[in-house]
């Protein structure tokens, strides 16, 4: 018996592995499996078993391609971006947003989209149209004006009607203001003539540089005059305020005020300025009432001056 060279354990395992792989490659894996299973079973039969090596691969087994790492460094999202369903939904969302913007511009500019090349309101610059809106009488006052409810949804006919309504309210305000002016001056002149010409004597109101002459002037006519004057002023100013609040005269009177227009333009950038506009309109209304009182007091000073000069 010839001596064979010594074989290491690793080499022996490799040779056995190669032999086993060669036998498996020849096929008949099922028969070999059944032979192994039936060894020593002389009494009980064992049903034939089919080896997995002889089974044909089916389409149910999905083959994975690409990155087999469970936690890859880079995620491939190209499939999600190029998915037809997602792209179609993104296109529909963008189209709906574009339609919403066009619809908004149509509402703002009376049915014409700015820059569409057609004649009319839409062909002008949007900034120029906005300045034109605020240059109209009664812009931004909030009562009896074309901007009181929703100016951007008004049609041209309705906008023209609102302009005519503002002009009519301005005319009515001027008429009532003239009526109150006539009543005030009539009441003031009647009060002055009654106290200093009818019931007063020749020195009822005389100007002099001498103190003893001024002390001879009776106090009763002047006191009664100012009492009646204060009563008439309170009644007239209260009536004017009530009528102005009911008919919206104060908002109409302040519609063309520079402060109100400046606050209207500023509120487009800072909506917080809207509350200051309400305060400004109220203060301008109070200023008009104060102007009524100051005008009547000025007339009283003029009448006293004329009487002191011409009454001697």
Swiss-Prot record:
Residues 197-224, 310-312 are lumenal. Its main location: endoplasmic reticulum. The keyword Transport applies. Residues 1-175, 245-288 are cytoplasmic. Keywords: Endoplasmic reticulum, ER-Golgi transport, Golgi apparatus, Membrane, Transmembrane, Transmembrane helix, Transport. Component of the Golgi to ER traffic (GET) complex, which is composed of GET1, GET2 and GET3. Within the complex, GET1 and GET2 form a heterotetramer which is stabilized by phosphatidylinositol binding and which binds to the GET3 homodimer. PANTHER family: GOLGI TO ER TRAFFIC PROTEIN 2. This is Golgi to ER traffic protein 2. It comes from Scheffersomyces stipitis (strain ATCC 58785 / CBS 6054 / NBRC 10063 / NRRL Y-11545) (Yeast). The lineage of its organism: Eukaryota, Fungi, Dikarya, Ascomycota, Saccharomycotina.
């Amino acid at each position: 018996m010839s001596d064979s060279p010594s074989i290491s354990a690793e080499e022996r395992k490799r040779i056995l592995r190669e032999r086993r792989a060669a036998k498996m490659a020849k096929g008949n894996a099922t028969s070999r499996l059944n032979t192994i299973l039936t060894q020593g079973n002389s009494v009980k039969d064992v049903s034939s078993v089919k080896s997995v090596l002889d089974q044909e691969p089916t389409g149910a087994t999905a083959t994975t391609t690409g990155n087999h790492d469970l936690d890859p460094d880079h995620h491939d999202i190209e499939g999600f971006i190029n998915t037809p369903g997602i792209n179609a939904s993104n296109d529909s969302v963008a189209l709906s947003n574009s339609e919403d913007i066009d619809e908004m511009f149509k509402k703002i500019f009376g049915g014409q989209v700015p820059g569409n090349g057609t004649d009319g309101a839409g062909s002008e610059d949007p900034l120029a149209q906005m300045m034109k809106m605020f240059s109209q009488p009664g812009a931004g006052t909030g009562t009896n004006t074309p901007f009181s409810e929703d100016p951007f949804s008004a049609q041209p006919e309705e906008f023209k009607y609102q302009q005519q309504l503002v002009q009519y309210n301005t005319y009515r305000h001027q008429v009532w203001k003239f009526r109150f002016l006539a009543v005030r001056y009539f009441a003031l002149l009647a009060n002055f003539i009654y106290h200093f010409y009818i019931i007063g004597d020749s020195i009822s109101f005389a100007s002099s540089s001498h103190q003893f002459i001024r002390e001879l002037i009776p106090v009763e006519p002047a006191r009664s005059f100012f009492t009646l004057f204060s009563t008439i002023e309170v009644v007239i100013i209260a009536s004017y305020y009530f009528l102005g609040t009911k008919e919206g005269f104060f908002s109409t009177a302040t519609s063309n005020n520079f402060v109100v227009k400046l606050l209207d333009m500023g509120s487009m950038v800072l909506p917080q300025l809207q509350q200051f506009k309400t305060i400004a309109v109220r203060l301008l209304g109070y200023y008009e009432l104060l102007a009524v009182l100051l005008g009547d007091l000025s007339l009283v000073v003029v009448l006293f001056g004329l009487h002191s000069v011409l009454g001697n």
